[in-house]
């Protein structure tokens, strides 16, 4: 009985709506920073894939023809290609890929994505048999991946704080709009001098126009 009474006077819950972020100076700065971060991460993924492909290509002219060398080059090349494609997928993802590929859902979070990039860069610091133009080694590519991971984490922290502030503001606005419930309107109704105006007000609010100018406790009780 009490639950039914509570449901009767329970206000209708409305969905919390977040206002679109106004494009201010801070918005432009954050958008520019996110674009730079994504470009850095795309470069890191591209060079990682290039390193894997070059290692596979080096199998054709290696001087060590042992099975162990072939296996090690194949494993390292596969690892580099896989991690590079993973980085490229994470940075070029769309709303469709986020919903369709549930396995890579952790790549949608800037914090976890940055940690994974740093881990990939740390593994690249190991002695991987890669040297391009006698200058670029796997250590340099690993440093690029680590840089992409660091800036990705910084981006996450900046946007998280801003989005959290927007969410708190949306919740405050929602609570302010939902403040006028049926009970509040019932006991705080306007005082009309004209009974016709009061009846029209009650009809507008969906109430019985026969009970005008009286609150719930002040209404007369009809004896049986």
Swiss-Prot record:
Entry's localization field: Membrane
Transmembrane segments: 39-59, 70-90, 103-123, 139-159
Keywords: Membrane, Transmembrane, Transmembrane helix
GO annotations of cellular component type: membrane
Name of this chain's protein: Uncharacterized transmembrane protein DDB_G0281339
Pfam families: COPI_assoc
Mode of membrane association: Multi-pass membrane protein
Main location: membrane
Highest taxon of source: Eukaryota
InterPro entries to which the protein is assigned, alphabetical: Golgi_TVP15 (IPR013714)
């Amino acid at each position: 009985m009490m639950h039914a009474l509570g449901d009767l006077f329970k206000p209708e819950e409305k969905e919390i709506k977040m206002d679109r972020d106004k494009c201010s100076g801070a918005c432009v700065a954050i958008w520019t920073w996110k674009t730079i971060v994504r470009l850095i991460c795309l470069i890191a993924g591209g060079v990682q894939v290039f390193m894997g492909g070059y290692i596979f290509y080096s199998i054709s002219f290696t001087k060590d023809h042992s099975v162990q060398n072939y296996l090690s080059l194949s494993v390292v090349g596969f690892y580099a290609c896989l991690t590079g494609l993973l980085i490229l997928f994470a940075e070029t993802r769309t709303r469709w890929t986020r919903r369709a590929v549930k396995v890579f859902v952790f790549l949608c979070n800037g914090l976890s994505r940055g940690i994974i990039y740093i881990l990939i860069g740390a593994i690249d610091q190991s002695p991987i048999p890669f040297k391009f133009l006698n200058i670029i080694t796997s250590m340099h590519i690993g440093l690029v991946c680590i840089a992409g991971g660091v800036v990705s984490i910084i981006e996450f922290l900046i946007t998280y704080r801003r989005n959290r502030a927007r969410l708190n503001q949306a919740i405050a606005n929602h609570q302010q709009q939902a403040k006028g419930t049926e009970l509040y309107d019932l006991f705080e109704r306007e005082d009309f001098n004209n009974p016709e105006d009061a009846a029209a007000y009650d009809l507008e609010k969906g109430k019985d126009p026969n009970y005008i100018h009286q609150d719930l406790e002040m209404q007369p009780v009809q004896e049986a």
